């Protein structure tokens, strides 16, 4: 169910804190600078050049939503075209830009760019100009479609059929809708990547079901799929400036959907709490600016602690996921750094050695938590190439002891999401 009602997302630009109105002269100067740089890159590399800018009508060309759309577009280009010979990003008040050079035929690059522009709504805001090694700009086989009516954009533009206000409103809607869907897809993928990672001690993975008799990988995948629409709405509510109470209400709906999908099994309750906070915070920062981790901490502090849960039963013995949230997710952020240097298994083991994991306390008491932390600390001292085999041994041990570091697994999923989303690139 769409909880936004009549609120909508069309006014998110109006609440953005750091937007700057630019002049026509600035736009023309930026275009001249871009052309000069294109010539320099053509002379240096001699390959096919791709110039990526955003079609944003009106005097405000740069905003977090615009930067997120371009950042996601670059990721799509990497998937569709492979890695370029050269890439450079330019962040300016006239809007984000990217220049890329490919060792591929220009018609091949243009064909894939056209597919990207037509694949989803946000592609209609992409301006992907392809230049041959000789400097010739490849033209489109047919005119682009109007954002408002779907007709040829050249006809509507010449006649000024729709007016700037309507075009800007439609652009805002496209960007906001894309952002919510994009972040939701990344969150779902992170949950699925976490459960598929193998071997994980005491946790469900491709090797076994860990210390759990009521869960397996397909169940976790169903759970992630059930949560995905709610992830989208958390991001949307954040952009719309929702209150903590509204977010909490949506959280209850999401939990019911998860339990319906799993037959009553709690697969992702802790992860749902963390992802709901972070997605809401990212949405708010897309609309208003700010730091997403500070924003998530403020939202978490405004929400009353849950009662009658595993987490509340052990909260007096360890801070649990709520303490992580009100602190701005420091563990997940550190784990993201480990992902870049050593990989997800090392990040998981590091968390197991440090985290006050409420799942472990619930299952094994303080002694169980201390045991897992000590064993994980021992694994951190091993050469990385020996880690998988050592993890399999620890997996067998924790299965026998019925210990599952579920809190560490949830934060690994959050770290995987942060790596994929890279909010520092667009906030």
Give the predicted meaning of each segment.
Residues 1-16:
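Single conserved hydrophobic/aromatic residue that forms the stacking wall/gate
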Residues 14-84:
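General detector of N-terminal leader/presequence modules that precede the first folded domain
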Residues 62-63, 106-113, 289-292:
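Short, conserved charged micro-motifs
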Residues 87-139:
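A broadly conserved sequence feature marking short terminus-proximal activation segments
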Residues 125-178:
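Cys/His-clustered metal-coordination modules, chiefly Zn-binding fingers
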Residues 162, 166, 398-427:
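C-terminal structured interaction module
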Residues 173-238, 244-245, 269, 282-396, ...:
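Phosphate-rich cofactor/ligand-interacting catalytic cores and adjacent structured alpha/beta frameworks
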Residues 262-283, 402-417:
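Conserved phosphate/anionic-ligand binding catalytic regions in large, soluble enzymes, centered on
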